[in-house]
């Protein structure tokens, strides 16, 4: 008798996606981050929903409503910190997921990769708007600085900024629209994730060797469900340790001060997961140039498939490319560190060198090294 999961239209869909899905037999733990991102998204939507029940999106009450959630709402403190630190965990998983895609050549699955880039940008926009909602000093000034970048757009810039603000400065209308967008975007992210999976299942998963695996596939369940559950437990352990022992470790102390338009914090900076892009923005002396560099730091991912010159998909057997890859990873860590430092010597110079190295590695060095490796293969 045929199991119900193979007959029922709805269960058949779930079955083909998560149970009987043919999966390469050799995919490593690096492939766990996709399912972890799904878990993060569920956690963020759930905790966010409960926070939205008690939050007040008005400049006069937003800060005190956060204090009310933390102090008076039953288990409000853990919901709040799970949401804040869950965002950090989501970005850790996201960066590792993108990093794995770069290393193993998953970017050659163009539809999946491009929807992934849209997902990354949407998630970054959602997180930025969420950072504004507590209406602390860093929320207010972060919103002012980042939204003000739109004024760099020629001709329509100033009008665009005032349209986003809902007035002549960041105030209640800005907060209300940011809350509205922050609430709706995770559901758009969920829809995009479904598309991401749809295109992934059209081609099938990549694998560490970067070769076709049609002759050697196994079902997703029970093998990879078990493997993913182990990853999920380790992820939850890390999240709970962070939330229960150091809930404010990744936050900014300035955000515990009510937003004040008359006092500027000594050092305005976004959340840690935006610092690499923030450094690139600061490294360009020109405002419009900085905004373009900021956008290109993410959109550069879209040109990586075009710049792929190697005869091999994966970097597994390309030692020179591996060296460049880890140089790029280290460079991103340096950019993140510099973003948290004040705008003074030597941090400005280090930031500029790291920014140039970031673009040079991706646009010039990686394609050249791949061509050299191709020649070395011919000589072998």
UniProtKB/Swiss-Prot annotation:
Heme 1 (or BL or b562) is low-potential and absorbs at about 562 nm, and heme 2 (or BH or b566) is high-potential and absorbs at about 566 nm. Belongs to the cytochrome b family. This is Cytochrome b. Its cofactor is heme b. The chain crosses the membrane at residues 33-53, 77-98, 113-133, 178-198, 226-246, 288-308, 320-340, 347-367. The gene is MT-CYB. It comes from Pan paniscus. Signal peptide: none annotated. It is a multi-pass membrane protein. One of its GO terms (cellular component) is respiratory chain complex III. Keywords: Electron transport, Heme, Iron, Membrane, Metal-binding, Mitochondrion, Mitochondrion inner membrane, Respiratory chain, Transmembrane, Transmembrane helix, Transport, Ubiquinone.
């Amino acid at each position: 008798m045929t199991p119900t999961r193979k007959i029922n239209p709805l269960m058949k869909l779930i079955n083909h996606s998560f149970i009987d899905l043919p999966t390469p037999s050799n995919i490593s733990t690096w492939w766990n981050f996709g399912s972890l991102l799904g878990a993060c998204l569920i956690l963020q939507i759930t905790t966010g929903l409960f926070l939205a029940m008690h939050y007040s999106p008005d400049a006069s009450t937003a800060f005190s409503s956060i204090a009310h959630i933390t102090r008076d709402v039953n288990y409000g403190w853990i919901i709040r910190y799970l949401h804040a630190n869950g965002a950090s965990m989501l970005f850790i998983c996201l960066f590792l997921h993108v990093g794995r895609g770069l290393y193993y050549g998953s970017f050659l699955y163009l539809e999946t990769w491009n929807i992934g880039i849209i997902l990354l940008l949407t998630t970054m926009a959602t997180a930025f708007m969420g950072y504004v909602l507590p209406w602390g000093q860093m929320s207010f000034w972060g919103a002012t600085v980042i939204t003000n970048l739109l004024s760099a757009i020629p001709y329509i810039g100033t009008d665009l900024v005032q349209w986003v603000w809902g007035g002549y400065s960041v105030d209640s209308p800005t907060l209300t629209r940011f809350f509205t967008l922050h609430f709706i975007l995770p559901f758009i992210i969920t829809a995009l994730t479904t598309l991401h999976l749809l295109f992934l299942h059209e081609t099938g998963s990549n694998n560490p060797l970067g070769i076709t695996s049609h002759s050697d596939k196994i079902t997703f369940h029970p093998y990879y469900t078990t493997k993913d559950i182990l990853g999920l437990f380790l992820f939850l352990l890390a999240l709970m340790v962070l939330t229960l022992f150091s809930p404010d470790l990744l936050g900014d102390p300035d955000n515990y001060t009510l937003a004040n338009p008359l006092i500027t914090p000594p050092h305005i900076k976004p959340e840690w997961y935006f610092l690499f892009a923030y450094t690139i923005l600061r490294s360009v002396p020109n405002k419009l140039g900085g905004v373009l560099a900021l956008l290109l730091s993410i959109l550069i991912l879209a040109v990586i498939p075009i710049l792929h010159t190697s005869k091999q998909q994966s970097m597994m057997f390309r030692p020179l490319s591996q060296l460049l890859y880890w140089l790029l990873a280290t460079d991103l860590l340096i950019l993140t560190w510099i973003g948290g430092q004040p705008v003074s010597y030597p941090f400005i110079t280090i930031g500029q060198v790291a920014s140039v190295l970031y673009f040079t590695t991706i646009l010039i060095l990686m394609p050249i090294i791949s061509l050299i490796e191709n020649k070395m293969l011919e000589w072998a």
